[in-house]
Amino acid sequence: MGVTELGKLIGREARREIKLENLAGRCIALDAYNALYQFLASIRQPDGTPLMDRQGRVTSHLSGLFYRTINLMEAGIKPVYVFDGKPPEFKLAEIEARRRVKEKAMEEVVKAIREGKRDDVAKYMKRVIFLTNEMVEDAKRLLTYMGVPWVQAPSEGEAQAAHMAKRGHCWAVGSQDYDSLLFGSPRLVRNLAVSPKRRSGEEVVEVSPEVVELDSVLKALKLKGREQLIDVAILLGTDYNPDGVPGVGPQKALKLVLEFGSLEKMLDTVLRGVSFPVDPLEIKRFFLNPPVTEEYALELKNVDERGLVNFLVGEHDFSEERVAKAVERLKKARARQKTSSLDSFFHGA
C-alpha cells in the first residue's frame, strides 16, 4: 500500500532517525509485500533484469529477504513478516490498473531490446515488478527455514501488523508506507528493508532508519485523532482512491480537515458534488475496522541449516560458500538473542 502524499505533511518534528542497534530487543512487524517489492526493485543486474536461477526463476526477493533479515537479527531485532491476504473488493479496480501499467512497461522493454537500447531496457525493467504466488510461497519457505516467524493476514498486511503493534505484541510496524499509522499502529519504522545507501538521481545518499510515532504526527498536525488523519489521507489519495480529490494537495487537505472537523461534514458541504470512484466513507470504515486475525505466533524458531542450504543452493543456485557464511551469521545472531532473552528473564530487565 502507499499513502505517499501524506508523507509530505509529516515533518521532522514527528520523525526520529535511529540506528538499527537502537531497536535491539524489539519485535518489528514487517510488511512482507512492501519489503519484497523493495528487494525486487533494487536488487538487479547491470542490464536492469532481476537476479534469476538457472531455470529463469526470479531470486532477487529471496536474496534481499535472506541477507537483510540476517542484518536485522544481528542488530538484535526480532522480525516478524506479515503477508497480505485477500484485498478489499474496492481495491480490485486499482490492482487491475497497476497490472495494465506493468504490461505497458513490458511492451516498452521488448521494444527497447529489439532496438538495442540498453538504457531504456534497464529503465523500463524497474517498472515491471511482479510478485507471483510462487514467489510469495518461496519467501515463506525461506523464513520458515530461517526460524523467522511470519503471519498470514486475512486482508491487508499492514492492517494486521498495526493490530499486532496496537496490542503490544510488536513494538512497531516496519514499512516504507504510512498506511500502518492509519490502521492505528502507535509507531512506524521506515528504511528497515532498504540498503543503507540508495541512489537518488546521479548521487548515492545515506539512508537511516527512522521512527514515526502516531501521537507525534497527530500533535504536529494539530489533529484530534486518527480519524482525522484518515480523512486527510482520503482527500490526498490512498490505495483505494489513488487520485484523491482533484485540486487538493497536502496543505489544503489538512486545512479542510481542521476547518470542517470530519470527512462526513465535508461531504455534505465543500465536497458536495465531487465524484468518488469508491465511497470515501467505506474507505474510512475499512481503515478503522479492517479484517485481522488473532491466530499468530511470534516466537523465533531454531535455524534449519540443511533446509536452508537445500532451498537456496540446491533449488535456486545461490553460492554455497556465501550461504554457508550467512547461515553461521544467522545462527550466531539467533544465539545472542536467546542469551539476551534469558538474561532479561532472570534479571527482570
Swiss-Prot record:
Quote the record's binding site residues for Mg(2+) 1.
Answer: 31, 84, 156, 158
Which terms are listed as keywords in the entry?
DNA damage, DNA repair, DNA replication, Endonuclease, Exonuclease, Hydrolase, Magnesium, Metal-binding, Nuclease
Broad EC category: hydrolase
Q: Which residues bind Mg(2+) 2?
A: 177, 179, 239
EC number(s) on record? 3.1.-.-
Gene Ontology molecular function terms on file: 5'-3' exonuclease activity; 5'-flap endonuclease activity; DNA binding; magnesium ion binding
Q: Which cofactor does it need?
A: Mg(2+)
* Entry-linked InterPro entries: 5-3_exonuclease_C_sf (IPR036279), Flap_endonuc (IPR023426), Flap_endonuc_arc (IPR019973), HhH2 (IPR008918), PIN-like_dom_sf (IPR029060), XPG-I_dom (IPR006086), XPG/Rad2 (IPR006084), XPG_CS (IPR019974)
State the superkingdom: Archaea
Q: How is the cofactor bound?
A: Binds 2 magnesium ions per subunit. They probably participate in the reaction catalyzed by the enzyme. May bind an additional third magnesium ion after substrate binding.
* N-domain: annotated segments: 1-102
Q: Where is this region: I-domain?
A: 120-261
Q: Does the keyword Nucleotide-binding apply?
A: no
Q: Name one GO biological process term.
A: DNA repair
Do you know which PANTHER family this protein is assigned to? Answer: FLAP ENDONUCLEASE 1, FLAP ENDONUCLEASE FAMILY MEMBER
Q: Which HAMAP family match?
A: Fen
Family per similarity comment: Belongs to the XPG/RAD2 endonuclease family. FEN1 subfamily.
Function text: Structure-specific nuclease with 5'-flap endonuclease and 5'-3' exonuclease activities involved in DNA replication and repair. During DNA replication, cleaves the 5'-overhanging flap structure that is generated by displacement synthesis when DNA polymerase encounters the 5'-end of a downstream Okazaki fragment. Binds the unpaired 3'-DNA end and kinks the DNA to facilitate 5' cleavage specificity. Cleaves one nucleotide into the double-stranded DNA from the junction in flap DNA, leaving a nick for ligation. Also involved in the base excision repair (BER) pathway.
Instruction: State the oligomer form and interacting partners.
Output: Interacts with PCNA. PCNA stimulates the nuclease activity without altering cleavage specificity.
Descriptive protein name: Flap endonuclease 1
Organism in which the protein naturally occurs = Pyrobaculum neutrophilum (strain DSM 2338 / JCM 9278 / NBRC 100436 / V24Sta) (Thermoproteus neutrophilus)
